[in-house]
C-alpha cells in the first residue's frame, strides 16, 4: 500500500481527534489502516462509547447512520456515500407499518442492516451476533423479524417456543452461495470445517460446522484445532483470519461471496474524507430519537 497515504491518514486522524472504524468486509487496504475493525455489533458499541470528535466509518450507509444515531454529538463521515446495502433497501417504514397493522401488538425485531427510518418503526434491533439473545429477551410469543428472512429462520431454530413473521428480505451476496458450491469445496477439502454466516440460505447453514457472525468466526477459527476452514461469508473476512492465524488455511466457499458496496471504499477515499471532513451522515432528530430507542434496547440485552 502507499505509505504516503497511510501516513497522511494517520496524521489527519490525530489532527481531527478522529477514530477510523472499518467493517470486517472492507478491502484489505482499509482494514489495514483502521483503528478498530469489527462486525456491526462491535462497531455500534465503539461508536456509542468513543471519545473521538469525528468517526470515519468505513462500511455501508446504514452503519454510518447507526453511528450518527448513537453519537449525535460526533461528526460521522462515510467516505463513500454511494456504499449502500441492497438488503436494507428491501424494507421501508410504510411497508413495515402495514405489516404491524396486520399483527397488532407484535414486537418488531429489526436487523441493523436497515435504514434509520425503519429502525425508528421497530421495537428493538439486533445483529447477527446477538439476534438469538435479543429475541429470547422478549416476553412475547410472536415476533416480526425484518428484513432478513435467512437470519430470521436461523434464529427461529434456536427459539422454537416463539412464532416468527418474516419480512422477505435477504443479502444478495450471501444468497449467491449455493449448496452445490459448498459441497464441491467440502469434497475438495475433506478435512476442512465449514463456517458460514446466518445470512446464508437455510440449506447452506444446515451444512455448516458453525454458523455465526463474523466476530464469532474469528474466535471459532482461532480456538479450533482444525487446520483448514471453508469460509462462507464475504471475502473481506479472509484478511484478518489469515493475519491472525498464519498457520491455518482459509478457503472461500464461493467466488460469488463478494459485496460490491463493501469494496467501494479505498485508502484514497478515506484520505479525501479526512481532508474535507465530508461526506457527513446525519439523521433527522425525530427519527434519530426513535431509532436510538431500538438500538439502546439491543445494547441493553446482556452479552454472553
Curated annotation (Swiss-Prot):
InterPro entries with a match to the protein in the record: NadA, NadA_sf, Quinolinate_synth_type2
GO terms under biological process: 'de novo' NAD biosynthetic process from L-aspartate
Binding site for [4Fe-4S] cluster: 85, 171, 259
Keywords: 4Fe-4S, Cytoplasm, Iron, Iron-sulfur, Metal-binding, Pyridine nucleotide biosynthesis, Transferase
Entry's EC annotation: 2.5.1.72
Gene Ontology cellular component annotations, sorted alphabetically: cytosol
Pathway terms, separated by semicolons: Cofactor biosynthesis; NAD(+) biosynthesis; quinolinate from iminoaspartate: step 1/1
Source organism, top-level taxon: Bacteria
SUPFAM superfamilies: NadA-like (SSF142754)
Cofactor: [4Fe-4S] cluster
Location in the cell: Cytoplasm
Binding residue positions for iminosuccinate: 23, 40, 111-113, 128, 197-199, 214
Cofactor: binding details: Binds 1 [4Fe-4S] cluster per subunit.
Catalytic activity: iminosuccinate + dihydroxyacetone phosphate = quinolinate + phosphate + 2 H2O + H(+)
Role noted for this protein: Catalyzes the condensation of iminoaspartate with dihydroxyacetone phosphate to form quinolinate.
Family designation: Belongs to the quinolinate synthase family. Type 2 subfamily.
Designated name of the protein: Quinolinate synthase
Origin species: Pelobacter propionicus (strain DSM 2379 / NBRC 103807 / OttBd1)
Gene it is expressed from: nadA
Amino acid at each position: 500500500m502507499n505509505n504516503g497515504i497511510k501516513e497522511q491518514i494517520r496524521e489527519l486522524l490525530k489532527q481531527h481527534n478522529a477514530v477510523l472504524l472499518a467493517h470486517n468486509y472492507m478491502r484489505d487496504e482499509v482494514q489495514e489502516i483502521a483503528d478498530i475493525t469489527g462486525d456491526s455489533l462491535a462497531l455500534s458499541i465503539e461508536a456509542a462509547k468513543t471519545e473521538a470528535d469525528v468517526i470515519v466509518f468505513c462500511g455501508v450507509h446504514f452503519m454510518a447512520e447507526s453511528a450518527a444515531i448513537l453519537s449525535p454529538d460526533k461528526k460521522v463521515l462515510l467516505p463513500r456515500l454511494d456504499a449502500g446495502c441492497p438488503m436494507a433497501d428491501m424494507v421501508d417504514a410504510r411497508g413495515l407499518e402495514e405489516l404491524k397493522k396486520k399483527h397488532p401488538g407484535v414486537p418488531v425485531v429489526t436487523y441493523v442492516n436497515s435504514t434509520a427510518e425503519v429502525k425508528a418503526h421497530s421495537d428493538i434491533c439486533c445483529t447477527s451476533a446477538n439476534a438469538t439473545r435479543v429475541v429470547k429477551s422478549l416476553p412475547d410469543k410472536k415476533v416480526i423479524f425484518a428484513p432478513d428472512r435467512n437470519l430470521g429462520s436461523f434464529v427461529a431454530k434456536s427459539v422454537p417456543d416463539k412464532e416468527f413473521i418474516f419480512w422477505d428480505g435477504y443479502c444478495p451476496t450471501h444468497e449467491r452461495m449455493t449448496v452445490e458450491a459448498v459441497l464441491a469445496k467440502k469434497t475438495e477439502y475433506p478435512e476442512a470445517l465449514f463456517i458460514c454466516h446466518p445470512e446464508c440460505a437455510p440449506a447452506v447453514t444446515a451444512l455448516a460446522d458453525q454458523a455465526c457472525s463474523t466476530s464469532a468466526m474469528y474466535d471459532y477459527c482461532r480456538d479450533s484445532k482444525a487446520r483448514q476452514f471453508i469460509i462462507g461469508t464475504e471475502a473481506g473476512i479472509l484478511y484478518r483470519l489469515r493475519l491472525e492465524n498464519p498457520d491455518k488455511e482459509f478457503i472461500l466457499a464461493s467466488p460469488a461471496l463478494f459485496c460490491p458496496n463493501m469494496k467501494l471504499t479505498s485508502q484514497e477515499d478515506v484520505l479525501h474524507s479526512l481532508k474535507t471532513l465530508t461526506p457527513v451522515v446525519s439523521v433527522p432528530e425525530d427519527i434519530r430519537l426513535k431509532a436510538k430507542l431500538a438500538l439502546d434496547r439491543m445494547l441493553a440485552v446482556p452479552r454472553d
